[in-house]
Structure formats: structure tokens, C-alpha cells
Amino acid sequence: MSQQNQVIFNGRYELHRRLGRGGMAEVSLARDQLLDRPVAVKVLFPALATDQGFVERFRREAQAAANLQHPNIVSVFDWGEANGTYFIVMEYVEGLTLADTLRDEGRLHPDRAAEITADIAAALGFAHRNGVVHRDVKPGNVLLTRDGGVKVADFGIARAISD
């Protein structure tokens, strides 16, 4: 975004460009001006922000993920509401989704596929041991970092095991 069109979200997050769009929110690359680091900001669509059911689901996503500190899970740093807009601030993961990688490269080498699967299993096992079930594991919610790491994202329809 140009300086003229620069958007500062919640007085702290300088939005740069859209990274993706899902069924209930849009994710943008931003800079956390307070901590001077890149972050991903997920903003609930305005049409859904008036529905308390969607807002509660969004809040549960933030809360579930924020309590899961694991190297294979995208970290959540912040969540809140600003002028009727609900948002989640997450770790920015530079890389591609597993879906994009499979589309671009086709089949993975079996060793790499096994590594990715083991990392996903580690993340989901950790979440499960901490009372959270993801419920939407798919290649589009698995991020592959530029250095070969794996991060599970989007706990949007996660639920507590006690639910």
C-alpha cells in the first residue's frame, strides 16, 4: 500500500497486502508497529461481525490457538475489536500452503511427505492433549515455511474436547 493509502489497524498494525480470504475472514500481511515485526492480521468479514454467533466462533478460534504454543502451530498474538471490526493477529509464516505446493509441484517425495505428516501429527497431538480438536485439517491450512518447517493454521472450527 502506498503511504497515502496506508491503513493502520487498531492503532498498531500497518496493513500491507492481502494474503488470503476464507469463508469468514480475510488475512493480510501487516507490520506490528509496536514490536517492529511482520504479522498476519485476520479480519472477520463486516457482514458476519453483526452476528454474535460468528463473533463468538472467531473469539474461540483466537483463544484456542493462543493457548497452543508449539513449533508446528501458528502462534496467535492478539485478538480484539476496533470500531466494530473483529480481528486476530498471528505469526506471519513466509512460505506456501501445502495445497499451493501440491498444485505447483505435484506429488511430494515420500520422505518429504512423511516429514510433513509427522509435523502435522505432532501439532494435532499437542492440540488434542491440550483439549483442542482442529476439525478442519486440510492442505490449505498447513503452511510450509521457506526453511522447510510446517505450521498448522486456522483453528476456525476448533472445539474444546469438553464441548
Go through the PLM ranges and name each one:
Residues 16-22, 27:
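Protein kinase glycine-rich loop
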Residues 31-38:
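Conserved N-lobe loop of protein kinases adjacent to the ATP-binding glycine-rich P-loop
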Residues 45-67:
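AlphaC helix of the eukaryotic protein kinase fold
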Residues 79:
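Activation-segment/catalytic-loop signature of the eukaryotic protein kinase fold
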Residues 116-117:
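Activation segment signature within eukaryotic-like protein kinase domains
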Residues 120-132:
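Protein kinase catalytic-loop region centered on the HRD/HxD motif
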